[in-house]
């Protein structure tokens, strides 16, 4: 057959792309590299910040295990089962992230007082309302028929993502809108957005195939890994403010 007359779907598959195994090993390897850098940096942090930084590292380790579960090489099928296991692992990871954010941000907001302190729970309420609306509009239809995912994704979104986003905003405000705190804020926003994209695309209209398409993995990874790297600056931001200024 003349290549020019090949069906469009065959022509689209012709460009070479990385083997699936290589792609996922690269993905997991990068997460392990960031974890290694964070562990090595522990010695540069003050003891108080290092204690909480270790909690964040444990959280990222859970997220890395979640990445393995979500990968196409995990052998966990179909997608609904894969995501059900991932909800638990990422729930632990991001729950730890949110706890440390709260520990860093809340005392500083309290010491500043003023509008930021008075409005802190209003921020949480607004984020919770927005998250709930997003789940209803974009996620609910995808997870219908999968009871654990339906309940789990709703609670995950309402509680953990509300806390992660809200406390990232708190921290940005408490750190006087610094560039390092901006990195943390963007990271705290990208991580939930990546999972919103994941649920919306991996289970479209209730379809439950075995493995997501390569493009869906790649697009989710850009958001997710970018968020993880930016959020990793949280201990650095906190430590730079807790140390006495040199004269």
Regions of interest found by a model, annotated:
Residues 1-247:
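Polytopic alpha-helical membrane-helix bundles and their juxtamembrane interface segments
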């Amino acid at each position: 057959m003349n290549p020019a007359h090949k069906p469009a779907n065959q022509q689209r598959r012709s460009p070479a792309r990385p083997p699936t195994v290589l792609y996922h090993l690269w993905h997991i390897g990068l997460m392990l590299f960031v974890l290694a850098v964070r562990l090595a940096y522990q010695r540069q942090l003050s003891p108080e910040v290092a204690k909480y930084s270790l909690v964040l590292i444990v959280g990222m380790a859970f997220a890395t295990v979640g990445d393995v579960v979500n990968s196409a090489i995990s052998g966990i099928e179909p997608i609904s089962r894969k995501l059900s296991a991932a909800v638990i692992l990422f729930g632990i990871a991001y729950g730890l992230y949110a706890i440390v954010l709260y520990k860093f941000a809340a005392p500083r907001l309290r010491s500043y007082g003023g509008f930021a302190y008075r409005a802190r729970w209003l921020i949480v309420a607004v984020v919770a309302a927005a998250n709930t609306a997003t789940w209803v509009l974009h996620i609910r239809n995808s997870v219908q028929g999968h009871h654990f995912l339906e309940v789990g994704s709703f609670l995950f979104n309402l509680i953990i993502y509300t806390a992660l986003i809200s406390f990232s905003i708190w921290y940005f405000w408490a750190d006087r809108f610094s560039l390092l705190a901006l990195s943390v804020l963007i990271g705290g926003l990208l991580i939930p957005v990546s999972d919103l994209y994941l649920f919306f695309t991996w289970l479209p209209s209730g379809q439950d195939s075995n493995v997501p398409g390569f493009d869906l993995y790649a697009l989710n990874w850009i958001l997710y890994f970018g968020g993880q790297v930016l959020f990793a600056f949280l201990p650095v931001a906190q430590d730079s403010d807790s140390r006495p200024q040199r004269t």
